[in-house]
Curated annotation (Swiss-Prot):
Protein name (Swiss-Prot/TrEMBL): tRNA (guanine-N(7)-)-methyltransferase
Family: Belongs to the class I-like SAM-binding methyltransferase superfamily. TrmB family.
Species this protein is from: Bacillus anthracis
EC number: 2.1.1.33
Keywords per UniProt: Methyltransferase, S-adenosyl-L-methionine, Transferase, tRNA processing
SUPFAM superfamilies recorded: S-adenosyl-L-methionine-dependent methyltransferases (SSF53335)
GO MF annotation list: tRNA (guanine(46)-N7)-methyltransferase activity
Lineage: Bacteria, Bacillati, Bacillota, Bacilli, Bacillales
InterPro entries listed in its UniProt record: SAM-dependent_MTases_sf, tRNA_(Gua-N-7)_MeTrfase_Trmb, tRNA_methyltr_TrmB_bact
Length: 217
């Protein structure tokens, strides 16, 4: 998908620097001070236009959320939503998630969401998938002990790869759905892509995976 250039994007992001946090590496270890409370912190890697994070933050005021999106022309759409109705428990980061361990201290995050990530279907691009072992290691580094990843996609190939990658990493798969919208799962909050794909009849896959607190036997 080609992203439309928005020349005003950086000016708007700079104007609302209390929402889109600049220099997040300077906040590592101090994100609870940014929010001004001791609530748990959940992050979404690849937050896109922010609907999921916005709806989650609105539904769960007792949890703090951070949406991470590297494309400026996309994250500004998420910002616009927050300008209309600011939520004190939602912040944004306009950076590449490859630097996750620089943005957060060890054990600072309670949960990671991955929603409809780029599948990078070509084999030579495997390392770019957000469930590749390098990314799994980064998530583990910033998550609390026994922290979780919640992952959704409509791409069967990426889902199967992700299950294998998580299992090989030694994670515990605590929830699995091969057809989320026809399951008994309650409280699902949709992303923009999820609504679009499911309306076309695409099956939505979901997995919740937990890092082990003890080595595998």
């Amino acid at each position: 998908m080609r992203l439309r250039h928005k020349p005003y994007a950086m000016d708007r992001i700079n104007e609302y620097s209390h929402i889109v946090i600049g220099n997040p590496e300077e906040r590592a270890g101090n994100w609870k001070e940014v929010f001004g409370n001791e609530q748990p912190i959940h992050i979404e890697v690849g937050t896109g236009r922010g609907r999921f994070m916005y709806d989650m933050a609105k539904a769960n005021p007792h949890i703090n959320y951070i949406g991470i999106e590297k494309f400026t022309s996309v994250v500004v759409d998420a910002l616009d939503k927050l300008i209309e109705e600011e939520l004190p428990n939602l912040k944004l980061i306009n950076k590449d998630a490859e630097d996750l361990t620089v943005f957060f201290a060890k054990g600072e995050i309670d949960r990671v969401y991955l929603n409809f990530s780029d599948p990078w279907p070509k084999k030579r691009h495997t390392k770019r998938r957000l469930t590749y072992k390098t990314f799994l290691r980064n998530y583990e580094e910033v998550l609390v002990e026994g922290g979780e990843i919640h992952f959704k996609t409509d791409n069967q190939g990426l889902f199967e790869y992700s299950l294998m990658s998580m299992a090989e990493y030694g994670m515990l798969l605590t929830y699995l759905s091969l057809d989320l919208h026809n399951s008994d799962f309650e409280g699902n909050i949709m992303t923009e892509y999820e609504e679009k794909f499911s309306s076309k009849g695409h099956r939505i896959y979901r997995v919740e995976a937990k890092y082990r607190t003890e080595p595998m036997q």
